[in-house]
Amino acid sequence: MKKLDKSIKAFEEAQDLMPGGVNSPVRAFKSVGMNPLFMEQGKGSKVYDIDGNEYIDYVLSWGPLIHGHANERVVESLKAVAEKGTSFGAPTEIENKLAQLVIERVPSIEIVRMVNSGTEATMSALRLARGYTGRNKILKFIGCYHGHGDSLLIKAGSGVATLGLPDSPGVPEGVAQNTITVAYNDLESVKYAFEQFGDDIACVIVEPVAGNMGVVPPIPGFLEGLREVTQQYGALLIFDEVMTGFRVAYNCGQGYYGVTPDLTCLGKVIGGGLPVGAYGGKAEIMRQVAPSGPIYQAGTLSGNPLAMTAGYETLIQLTPECYKEFERKAEMLENGLRQAAEKHGIPHHINRAGSMIGIFFTNERVINYDAAKTSNLEFFAAYYREMIEQGVFLPPSQFEGLFLSTAHSDADIEATIAAAEIAMAKLKA
């Protein structure tokens, strides 16, 4: 058994200081039945806990660290910027540089506004959609998580799903009444909702790949159908690419699937490990945002030079060749996990989109949240604990996906497959 004495002690202390001992619920490791690991250091594809244990990391800070930990170019640039000042409350040139990169690479974005988190991005995009259309209702998908804004904490995924919560107390009934929810990948339900409420639906918000119920890609025609129905009814289509943005492809999920939304929300990768979000889209829509237009949004630290620098240095290193390597490595890991499960007769279904991978312990084809919930959660928890013993750090939730980075080597992937083989052999025995 791995020695985790220091992590156990740190968590005991933390529970007296913070709700549940953490600053984001999934970090408490509740659903996998073990004490959370307290991390001390990361380098490349590895992380090290405060007890000195080394792990191959597939959490990558929940996706942002697409070049792995302590990327030299990012770190050196941050040092240089920090010496000049961390924030000014005034524009800086690095904001222009990052905005230009985003606009060049994201098909839907003509103008972009930087914010501080993915939640800020989605909340701001919803306000913009409502203000632009003059409508009140939004349509989202069951099990899709778009941050913790009130309108979006209705049948959400991610940490909400991990804790088994359908919704969150504290969301006013009046707010919830303006959120329509339907099953992901169910285009007929979307069409029915528009037939009933189409004149008052401001937008449809969707993850191009549902990354917060595990990893659930869109079925053929689903995203295209959303584009068609929103255009038919004059509603906006918002892609929440906080997770998929620059993760699944060079041009994000919209480039990967060839569907262009009206607005796009970004986060994670564009911050390079620092707190960043963004939303952008067609110029005629984005010009409605203050100070160009009447729809208000602001932020004290929005566009701060540290975050902009980390984002710029992260994106500038991402080339089309990087994504070819992601595909090769992710396919290698996917096939290895599948073969290990098949060898031991373990029910499983594996989904992948680019460098995002989700393994479900079920025989069902996982195309929506109901199917994701058929996964054997007890088996997942046991599998998770065994993988920790083997030195592999996975997201501590069935409803989160694995992420690869440019720092992961073939040897890392081979070691991970070998660890899964050992874990599954033990659990099947």
From Swiss-Prot:
Identify the GO cellular component terms for this protein: cytoplasm
Gene3D superfamilies, alphabetized: Aspartate Aminotransferase, domain 1, Type I PLP-dependent aspartate aminotransferase-like (Major domain)
Q: Name where it's found.
A: Cytoplasm
Enzyme Commission number(s):
5.4.3.8
Tell me where on the tree of life, at the top rank, the source sits.
Bacteria
Query: Which PROSITE patterns has this protein been placed in?
Result: AA_TRANSFER_CLASS_3 (PS00600)
Q: Does the keyword Metal-binding apply?
A: no
Sites of N6-(pyridoxal phosphate)lysine modification: K268
Family per record: Belongs to the class-III pyridoxal-phosphate-dependent aminotransferase family. HemL subfamily.
Supply the HAMAP family for this chain. HemL_aminotrans_3
Subunit-structure text: Homodimer.
The name under which this protein is listed is Glutamate-1-semialdehyde 2,1-aminomutase 2
This chain's source organism reads Bacillus cytotoxicus (strain DSM 22905 / CIP 110041 / 391-98 / NVH 391-98)
Phylogenetic placement of the source organism: Bacteria, Bacillati, Bacillota, Bacilli, Bacillales
